[in-house]
């Protein structure tokens, strides 16, 4: 009997087939889930390696983190929100590995402090230098995580015919206008039927949305690109971009 996955890959294009496989897994097909993870181990290792900047063996802790993250991506993936499973999985894997590295760095710093306590002035100076080095490393890790979020966000924007440059050029200039646009986006995602229109047709349901919000149709249409982008962020697996939303709403 041929493996379930090899049969699935005969159904059509790879992306469509992968989505079918994920749909089956999310309905409880554990055998297929194990096969899919096994097949994509090279992808997982490559993604983890891009973060760690070294060769990754399956015995490495970082690979195990990547494996868990890939499995999480399979369970959380929703094709209606745009972009491919692999793009989504790449974001989740990199984020989880970066979090792991950050925790390991913090643990190493605590050990360093314990070892250096009670030592002379020279040792204290070494400790300060070590702490500064770890802080710089953390900043680099955070910058990498922000960059990965932006790259994934750009891929999602592309599904809606938008670019990051267009978004910057078409963002509302005033804080209150940005706040209103974000509230419109929040209203949209709260209504499943409107969110479904956005996800499937890649268009803003302006007519239906107009009846639910306190801003005019003209305002909705003028801020269409920004509202779509905010919907992507609200419903997406973003950390730093959601902080941006909170910052706008509370400014």
UniProtKB/Swiss-Prot annotation:
Gene3D superfamilies, sorted: 1.10.1740.10
GO cellular component labels: cytoplasm
Pfam families cross-referenced by the UniProt entry: Sigma70_r2 (PF04542)
Motif (Polymerase core binding) on chain: 61-74
Major subcellular site: cytoplasm
Knockout or disruption consequences: Cells lacking this gene exhibit normal cell morphology and growth rate at 37 degrees Celsius, but cannot grow at high temperature.
Entry's induction text: Part of the sigI-rsgI operon, which is transiently induced by heat stress. Expression is positively autoregulated via the sigma-I promoter. In exponentially growing cells, expression is regulated by the WalRK two-component system, which represses the sigma-I promoter and activates the sigma-A promoter, leading to the formation of a basal level of SigI. WalRK can also positively and directly regulate transcription of the operon under heat stress through a binding site located upstream of the sigma-I promoter. Repressed by glucose.
GO MF terms held by the record: DNA binding; sigma factor activity
Compartments reported by the entry: Cytoplasm
Alphabetical keyword list: Cytoplasm, DNA-binding, Sigma factor, Stress response, Transcription, Transcription regulation
Database matches in PANTHER family: RNA POLYMERASE SIGMA FACTOR SIGI, SIGMA FACTOR F FLAGELLAR
Family designation: Belongs to the sigma-70 factor family. SigI subfamily.
Name of the protein this chain belongs to: RNA polymerase sigma factor SigI
Taxonomic placement: Bacteria, Bacillati, Bacillota, Bacilli, Bacillales
GN (gene name): sigI
């Amino acid at each position: 009997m041929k493996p379930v996955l090899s049969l699935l890959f005969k159904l059509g294009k790879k992306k469509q087939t992968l989505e079918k496989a994920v749909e089956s897994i999310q309905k409880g097909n554990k055998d297929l889930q194990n096969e899919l993870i096994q097949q994509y181990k090279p992808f997982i290792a490559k993604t983890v390696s891009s973060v760690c900047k070294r060769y990754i063996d399956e015995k490495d802790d970082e690979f195990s983190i990547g494996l868990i993250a890939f499995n999480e991506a399979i369970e959380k993936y929703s094709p209606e929100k745009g972009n491919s499973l692999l793009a989504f999985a790449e974001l989740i894997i990199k984020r989880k590995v970066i979090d792991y590295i950050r925790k390991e760095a913090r643990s190493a710093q605590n050990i360093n402090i314990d070892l250096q306590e009670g030592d002379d002035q020279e040792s204290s100076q070494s400790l300060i230098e070590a702490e500064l080095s770890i802080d710089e490393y953390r900043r680099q890790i955070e910058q990498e995580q922000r960059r990965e979020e932006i790259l994934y966000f750009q891929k999602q924007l592309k599904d809606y015919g938008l670019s990051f440059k267009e978004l910057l050029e078409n963002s509302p200039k005033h804080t209150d206008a940005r706040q209103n646009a974000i509230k419109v986006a929040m209203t949209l995602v709260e209504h499943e039927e409107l969110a479904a229109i956005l996800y499937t047709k890649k268009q803003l349901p302006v007519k239906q949305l107009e009846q639910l919000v306190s801003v005019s149709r003209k305002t909705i249409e003028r801020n269409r690109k920004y509202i779509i982008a905010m919907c992507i962020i609200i419903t997406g697996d973003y950390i730093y971009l959601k902080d941006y939303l909170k910052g706008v709403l509370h400014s």
